[in-house]
Amino acid sequence: MADDGEADRDLARLVVLCVGRLEETGDPWEPCRLLDAGGSVVVPVSEFLAELQAQDSSVSTLRSYGNDLLLWWRWLAAAGVAWDKVTPAEGRDFARWMQVADKPARPHWRDRVGSPPGVSRGPVTAGPAAVTVNPVTGKASPGRKFSASSRAHAETVLRRFYDFRLESGRGPIMNPFPLDRSRRRGRAHAHRNPLEPFAHERTGRYRPRQPRRIPRRIPDEQFDQIFAGLKSHRDRALLAFWVSTGARAEELLDSVQDDVRPGDQLIAVTRKGSRAVQELPASPDAFVWLRLYQEEIWRKGAPRGRRHPLWFTLRRPFRPLAYPAARAMFTRAQQLLGTNWSIHDLRHTGAWRMARDPEMSLTDVQWVLGHAHLSTTQLYTTPDQNEVIASALAHHERRARRGPASSPPPPAAGYNPDSLGVLFGRPS
């Protein structure tokens, strides 16, 4: 509960401006740093990111945590509260704001060029007014509201940040994002039966409940149409590798030229979580498209060598292909079809194809996908939404062909069917 003496905060009128920014330095000692509205480094966040780096967190994790802390700093600036003066009342209001308010509109990158540090100028861009479902794919598009997964991630990040500050003795005397009240009775899973699986227990008090999502695959006919619309051998090779290996997008984009072994049909990737190098089998056509792409780009003067990146931009100067550029390529390829599949859906598609192969065991699929638990791989054995819809429509069609059910004949001559219906409760 919030303190009785706290000042009322009108969240409906709270305007969160896009002040401050998260800067990627390229320095391995400090990959990311948070800058406030005046362009100064936020030291408490830098210390927290250094702690995460010491815990062997990847650069993408530091970037993800930094973005949530940037949103929190912007919200505190709008609320007029210092980061070390917050209470659970601010944590509660922040959770309510993320649940109800629209996302802060971000200015276009062209309008940010030449602006002072931490200050945005020019018009702002906002997403669609409401979540819409794509009529072709059935996937919901992002709206102006924060998703439940984004809110849950922000709650986890901020709770860990203030736990770190409490351990160092520099910060508020209590965490503004406390644990759920049920956790006060003892540790989690204290009385669990060892013969039963772990049950999900609520962690944070302001952590939202997330719906269980079933992975969505791209139907074969839509994948073929997207593949036919690609403009370059590089893009064809990328899609062929993504869908045949089941690798994550950035795992494949981080590969170097020495990671490819065409003779064995293997390509090495660095796993997202464990950072372990794993060789993955790929389809033969993926290596054909890769060779065509390499010969084409090498003739244009792209770097060639064992330790050079495998994927480059198609125009000079040749730079390593980054995830935003690959995502833009995949989005452009779907414009004519009107679909909104993501690159990660290619991983789901490859996993679904392997899991549905009767001659491939589920443990083999788990190894290829790099899942820590077999239960995660089992998600791909659930019926696909398109298959369930087709099966239900076929059921209705069969019932329509059979026509209305004929009334049973009377048990013997002389019985009135209406009287039998009244006696036995059947409709007349």
Pin down the residues of each PLM region.
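Short, basic (Lys/Arg/His-rich) helix/loop patches that form interaction surfaces
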Residues: 327-367
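Flexible interdomain linker/hinge and immediately adjacent N-terminus
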Residues: 92, 171-225, 270-273, 313-318
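C-terminal secondary-structure termini that scaffold catalytic or DNA-interacting sites
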Residues: 3-6, 395-428
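C-terminal catalytic core of Y-nucleophile DNA break-rejoin enzymes
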Residues: 273-292, 307-329
